[in-house]
A protein has these predicted regions:
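Surface-exposed loop/interface segments of Gram-negative outer-membrane beta-barrel transport/assembly proteins
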Residues: 1, 24-121, 137-190
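Outer-membrane beta-barrel strand-turn architecture
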Residues: 7-10, 43-46, 128-134, 189-190
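Transmembrane beta-barrel domains of bacterial outer-membrane proteins
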Residues: 10-12, 16, 35-39
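Transmembrane beta-strand segments that form the barrel wall of outer-membrane beta-barrel proteins
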Residues: 17-23
Length: 190
């Protein structure tokens, strides 16, 4: 994380940028976030103004299964990889290892999900105060959100008696925005 700030009698600023990464404690799970923020404000005569802008980008690759439960349900004698099975991963069979536990390594390798989120929040204000008893203020704000969910399932199995499925892929997107525009006139004379 890096930040820079400063100012004087007529204004001030603050700028920051950050990066966060977490690979998780279980196989196949990551999180990355990039963030940027800038705030400024100033005053000149009858006018004062300011803005606040924040942007973030997050990338998430979550686990596809409950890895801990799957490790407990799989017998320790079942190999992770087995070239005789579709996809090349080991899992139970009725003759030797009759379990319907999920091979968590196979599940993470064969099924992939990725979330990407962009978010921009900002506000801007301007105030005009020609007299102590009279002021006008404009306030504007915006919240933009862009979301993408990608999913891919490769060919192969991760548990016994699983039906064959051809590879498939899905992608979903969502874009939303909210805006605020506000005008305020204040009169306060005793």
């Amino acid at each position: 994380n890096v930040s820079l700030s400063g100012g004087g009698d007529s204004g001030s600023y603050f700028v920051s940028a950050g990066y966060y990464n977490n690979d998780g404690v279980s196989y196949g799970n990551t999180f990355d976030r990039y963030s940027f923020r800038v705030n400024t404000q100033g005053k000149k005569g009858w006018f004062s103004f300011g803005e606040n802008l924040a942007y973030s980008l997050t990338n998430t690759d979550p686990n596809q299964t409950n890895t801990y439960n799957d490790f407990l349900r799989m017998m320790p004698t079942i190999p992770i990889y087995d070239e005789n099975n579709p996809g090349g991963y080991g899992y139970g069979d009725a003759a030797k290892y009759n379990t319907f536990g999920v091979n968590p390594i196979a599940r993470e390798d064969l099924e992939y999900r990725h979330f990407r989120q962009n978010r921009l929040n900002g506000s801007l204000w301007l105030e005009f105060k020609p007299f102590e008893f009279l002021s006008y203020k404009f306030n504007g704000g915006i919240d933009l959100y862009f979301y993408e969910n990608s999913w891919f399932r490769g060919e192969g199995n991760w548990t016994q008696n699983q039906e064959h499925r051809d590879p498939e892929s899905q992608k979903a997107r969502d874009n939303t925005y909210n805006m605020l525009i506000e005008h305020t006139l204040n009169f306060n004379k005793d």
